[in-house]
Amino acid sequence: MNKNGIPRRKLLDFAALIAATGLSLLAFAQFSQAQIPASSGSALQAASSKTSAEKAYQFQNTMMDAYASGSTVRLAQSYSDQALGATAFTYDNAVAIDAYLLRESHDDVARAEVLGNGLIYAQATNFPFNDGRFAQAYFVNTLAPDGSGAYITPAGFPFYFYGSAVGDQAWAGMALAQLYRRTHQQQYLTAALKVANWIVANTYNTLGPGGYSFGSVINQFNQSVPSPNGKSTEHNIDTYAFFSMLAEITHNGNAANGASWSSLAQHALDFVLAMYNPAGGYFYTGTLGDQVTINPFPIPEDCQDWSYLALLNNNYANTIDWALANLQTTDTAASPHSSLTGSEKITGIVFDTASLSTNPAAYPFADPTAVWLEGTAHSVAALIARIMVGRGSPSRFKDLETVEFFVNNSETAQSEFGAGQTVNGMPIPVGEGLVASTSVMDTGFGYTYGPSLHIGATGWYLIGLQGGNPFQLGYRSLRP
């Protein structure tokens, strides 16, 4: 058994599968670390992926060290300066922690701990409430005024990213739980339990199929009020995975309200399964604001791929195929408002069904064929998980081919996008990070993505390349 807990027999099966299809992935090399011989063509592909991963990690380091370095408590800026300035999104930093912990070098683990300490500081000093929640984002370009030496301050004007969506809380909690498992440092578990208890106390919902509501927003009077949004399938997937981790770490311990973490995880799962459309083979996005009525449009990618990563249940494996069939696109220079030029073309996944039919009145410069590189990496991770869980399935060969195809397209995007972008005014080398999307992309939820270098997209690319699963404690899609 290797250090990730994957039985060597299963690794050898995966190696044989790769050899049979003529493919080679950094994912397998990172999983096994067994240096199993491959064909010369496969070896070249593996070397390319390894180089791509090393460059991607360098981008993550650049973004993390833009304003401070070493052990200074901080979070990493999410996008290049050209997008949202020195803003660090809580979710993006959780993904960055996962990517660092997956590679497991001494420096990577140290960086994950620094970001984890940043989350702990952000939680303890969160404005305007420090009751265990995290804000959506923070500013990371100035010293905090409290003398702590941390580079984390509230993300006020002009964005006011003070709200606390349940998905962001769960992602921060999962990253902290993973840090606790890796380091056994109590402060990470303490912070994870604080945010978990905030979720339970503030969003546990009994309307309709139950689950957890969207979260809280901060109004103009700096008061915390429930979000008017409907319940989110994605948020409940995240919460199910997070509370399942806590059940394992605490040996099925209880939340502050006395309920077991496993029962609280089941409450989220009940909602998720109620959102499944068996006729269509996909999960709905969630409910409308009444917390009961299913919201039929748009249908997002993350619910399809993340549900499999969280559940590892082949009864719902077809949701991956639904996303591939209905959310795959190719961005070319001929596409409306594309940022591509010449003969460039990138194939991958979009955010949701609304992305393919953009609203010209709201977003006149959106490209209906823009590729969401983070979502493409979600699909890579889900496909690798399906290969590992259902290794006897004939579809594993097709899944591997799709993985290699998406990885190749992502490597192309990595090498060609992001020229002229900066962090803290300093140029970011071309060919390291991945942009959020190849062109401006309408999500259908009132915001867009664009071709700005992004630690979230890059972090998920690294997770996918290494076959990681952040919804499972220890990142394993297989249990020993």
Q: Which residues does each PLM region occupy?
A:
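Alpha-helix exit/C-cap motif
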Residues: 99-104, 175-178, 182, 245, ...
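Extended ligand-binding clefts on enzyme/binding-domain cores
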Residues: 39-79, 86-91, 121-157, 163-167, ...
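N-terminal glycine-rich cofactor-binding segment that shapes the pocket for flavin-like pterin cofactors
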Residues: 163-171, 175, 179
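Boundary at the C-terminal end of the N-terminal hydrophobic targeting segment
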Residues: 29-34
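Non-membrane alpha-helical segments in proteins
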Residues: 92-102, 114-118, 171-175
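N-terminal secretory signal peptides and thylakoid transit peptides that target proteins
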Residues: 2-18
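Alpha-helical support elements that line or immediately flank enzyme active sites
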Residues: 99-106, 304-305, 311
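Bacterial N-terminal signal peptides
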Residues: 16-27
